[in-house]
């Protein structure tokens, strides 16, 4: 049975699916504009996608911009994500730089949740998870498949592997090649929900998989990602439309 996680009074893993909005910007001016544009949008979690920054190779600059986000959204849970090129991100970097950056963000205690890529070396991943939790930051372990949807058993196994590494939240995103692939992801989500003790987050990407971003509460995905000003992944739905649809589904269930 999945246990919930409470971050800044936001309950993840129980009740309605929470909406995370990615903050995508190249520099300080764009970040300021994005923060202004999203401030009244109906989202629950802010995800800062630092890999989109032009200064993504500077840890000091990233810390500065993260502080800006934290100051602008003091009451929202802040998820820090630095997606590497190999998993669909905008910045290719070494393992050494990646974990040095994560450690710096963890030590700063600016984010409430930190994204850690599962397949980055088990020892380093476990150390990052432990360091995050020691500093009061939830660890979200993730994996992304941008070209295929693995079999149901493999998806469930990866989510379980994340939990075994100590994750507070387990996330996987896959790319469907058919409608059947979307059903595979949803079936895997339902199965993982039955087995996992931590909140899980799943999505089938692209237009074909968009329905998975709306069905989390039914199948067991705790967070859905909706675009604020710019998509950070294929198939994201605008935050306002996403909220309206989730409200409609919830209210129409009576």
From Swiss-Prot:
InterPro entries the record matches: Aldolase_TIM, DHquinase_I, Type-I_3-dehydroquinase
Keyword annotations from UniProtKB, A to Z: Amino-acid biosynthesis, Aromatic amino acid biosynthesis, Lyase, Schiff base
Keyword Lipid metabolism: no
An annotated GO BP: 3,4-dihydroxybenzoate biosynthetic process
Residues given in the record as 3-dehydroquinate binding sites: 47-49, 83, 213, 232, 236
Reaction it catalyzes: 3-dehydroquinate = 3-dehydroshikimate + H2O
Family to which the UniProt record says this protein belongs: Belongs to the type-I 3-dehydroquinase family.
Pathway: Metabolic intermediate biosynthesis; chorismate biosynthesis; chorismate from D-erythrose 4-phosphate and phosphoenolpyruvate: step 3/7
Keyword Secreted: no
Enzyme Commission (EC) number: 4.2.1.10
This protein's name: 3-dehydroquinate dehydratase
A UniProt-annotated Pfam family: DHquinase_I
Enzyme kind, highest EC tier: lyase
Described purpose of this protein according to its UniProt entry: Involved in the third step of the chorismate pathway, which leads to the biosynthesis of aromatic amino acids. Catalyzes the cis-dehydration of 3-dehydroquinate (DHQ) and introduces the first double bond of the aromatic ring to yield 3-dehydroshikimate.
